[in-house]
Design a protein with these regions (language model features):
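Rossmann-like NAD(P) dinucleotide-binding subdomain of oxidoreductase/dehydrogenase enzymes
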Residues: 128-273, 399
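Structural signal for hydrophobic packing residues in well-ordered secondary-structure cores
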Residues: 61, 65, 80-87, 91, ...
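Short, well-ordered beta-strand elements within core beta-sheets of diverse protein domains
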Residues: 39-45, 60-66, 152, 261-264, ...
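Conserved C-terminal structural/oligomerization subdomain of aldehyde/semialdehyde dehydrogenase
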Residues: 37-40, 201, 225, 262, ...
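Hydrophobic face of amphipathic alpha-helices that form TPR/SEL1-like repeat modules
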Residues: 1-34, 357
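Residue-level signal for inorganic ion chemistry
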Residues: 36, 72, 94, 116, ...
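ALDH superfamily catalytic-core signature
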Residues: 235-379, 402-403, 442, 492-493, ...
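Glycine-rich loop-to-alpha-helix module at the N-terminal edge of alpha/beta enzyme cores
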Residues: 37-126, 137
Length: 504
């Protein structure tokens, strides 16, 4: 790997294959959330720099789209090998800038690596369809062709996985790409981009700019950008979808969530409790697919003390420390927001079963730590239920029947993920049929599909009809062209002028 992205050097822009020092006057700190140490600074690119990145991508598209599909596949094969080789180093940087544990950082990278592996089979994924002799001597076939320059806007919570959801599949399809990583933790993302260059991605095919709303808006409105992929908050995702859509872009916008885990009394108790605690408090609750609501059904209401006892055992510490279960949240601002929501839950009458507000971590006293926090007695009008908390806070609601649980989940505006814990096949089938959520786990707490499928959040969690990775994203990053052809022999009989719409 080149020294241009050595950890803890200031972030640079990537334009036309060159790492560029930004000429901006606006720089932001990249802060270790466990220590408040400033690791590096990230520039907010100027308008001219954003335009230069897009122009480089537009120029590169003219040749990249003609690159044989086998050559693109071989670059993906090299990239996945390089990611494996450097994964531990990347995970160390990711943990330092984002706060998650080393093991979780490695998982972040691995789940993205799976998408790169799937991109290695782009030759079969991008094939069109063919129908022979649809009319006399007439054949019809489709071509899946790249659409042009695509943009990706990624969040802080998965600085490896989500960029890898985007740019590998986009460029494997023959497009070029402009990536805007999160300004809060871009260093590990840049390490992955460096590996993409080392794997053979040509100059201009992959570009990187940093910034805030101005850069986001530029990507959404520039004439040469044909598609925008976004993962992040509902507020920003709605803005991106509306703005880019008004400017004629394809848009996929993955947004907020309120994921419910429904627990029936016949579920395997130990496995279920472990799953709930891991999915609720892992990554400090900063996952768009985190379990944030536990719905205890019928006799499962008696499980609350066990849930509390297990959550109390989790170790809160810096992500770099061995044995850590829960690291810090990303920033002081995020911590204050979560603390405010906890306070609102108390004021609105929920029962605070486990209070993580005043936790102290020796050696990391300045860290953005919140311990596992558990509420019971929660109602659907409380802020801790209606808002996405994005912190280590789990709320418990009790109902009497599975039908009531399904109605509860379906009444929530979000539709990212849900899970049912049961030993009953009949209950599982009923749940998966009647639930109005895009991704369903049966005894699986975080049902994020593997890349052979696609990420299929729904309702208030997603705007756009095609999701990231899998077959859907190949559709998103390609244009279908349908060709209908007829070839005549020299001795073909001329049927004269055909003034009808029928082929003959």
């Amino acid at each position: 790997m080149n020294v241009s992205t050595t950890p803890y050097q200031n972030a640079r822009l990537l334009i036309d294959g060159e790492w560029v020092e930004s000429q901006t006057t606006e720089w932001h700190d990249i802060i270790n959330p466990a220590t408040q140490q400033v690791l590096a600074k990230v520039p907010f690119a100027t308008a001219a720099e954003v335009n230069a990145a897009i122009a480089a991508a537009q120029r590169a598209f003219q040749t990249w789209k003609l690159t044989p599909i086998g050559a693109r596949m071989r670059i993906m094969l090299k990239l996945q090998a390089l990611i494996r080789e450097h994964s531990k180093r990347i995970a160390t940087v990711l943990s330092a800038e984002q706060g998650k544990t080393i093991a979780d950082a490695e998982g972040d990278i691995f789940r993205g690596l799976e998408v790169v592996e799937h991109a290695c089979s782009i030759g079969t994924l991008q094939m069109g369809e063919f129908a022979e002799n649809v009319a006399g001597g007439v054949d019809t076939y489709t071509l899946r062709q790249p659409i042009g320059v695509c943009a990706g806007i990624t969040p802080f919570n998965f600085p490896a996985m989500i960029p890898l959801w985007m740019f590998p599949m986009a460029i494997a399809c023959g497009n070029t790409f402009v990536l805007k990583p999160s300004e809060q933790d871009p260093l590990s993302t840049l390490m992955l981009v460096e590996l993409a260059l080392e794997a053979g991605v040509p100059p201009g095919v992959l570009n990187v700019v940093h910034g805030g709303k101005d850069v986001v808006d530029a990507l959404c409105t520039h004439t040469d950008i044909k598609a925008v992929s976004f993962v992040g908050s509902t507020a920003v995702g709605t803005h991106v979808y509306d703005l880019a859509g008004r400017h004629g872009k394809r848009v996929q916008s993955m947004m907020g969530a309120k994921n419910h885990a429904v627990v029936l009394a016949d579920a395997n108790r130990e496995q279920t409790l472990n799953a709930l605690v891991g999915a609720g408090f892992g990554a400090s609750g900063q996952r768009c697919m985190a379990t944030s609501v536990v719905v205890l059904v019928g006799a499962a209401k008696k499980w609350l003390p066990d849930l509390k006892a297990l959550a109390q055992k989790l170790k809160v510490n810096a992500g770099s420390e061995a044995g850590t279960d829960v690291g810090p949240v990303i920033s002081r601002r995020a911590k204050e927001r979560v603390l405010g929501l906890i306070e609102s839950g108390i004021k609105e009458g929920a029962v605070l079963e486990l209070d993580g507000r005043n936790i102290k971590v020796p050696g990391f006293e300045q860290g953005n730590f919140i311990g596992p926090t558990l509420f019971s007695g929660v109602t659907t009008d409380m802020q801790i239920y209606t808002q996405e908390i994005f912190g280590p806070v789990l709320v418990v609601i009790e109902v009497d029947t599975l039908d009531q649980a399904i109605a509860l989940v379906n009444a929530n505006p979000f539709g990212n993920g849900t899970g049912l814990f049961t030993q009953s096949g009949a209950a599982a089938r009923k749940f998966q049929t009647e639930i109005d959520v895009g991704q369903v786990g049966i005894n699986i707490p975080i049902p994020v599909p593997v890349p052979f499928f696609s990420f299929t959040g729904s309702r208030g969690s997603k705007l756009g009809d095609l999701g990231p990775y899998g077959k859907q994203v190949v559709q998103f990053y390609t244009q279908t062209k349908t060709v209908t052809s007829r070839w005549f022999d020299d001795d073909s009989v001329n049927d004269g002028v055909n003034t009808t719409i029928n082929l003959r």
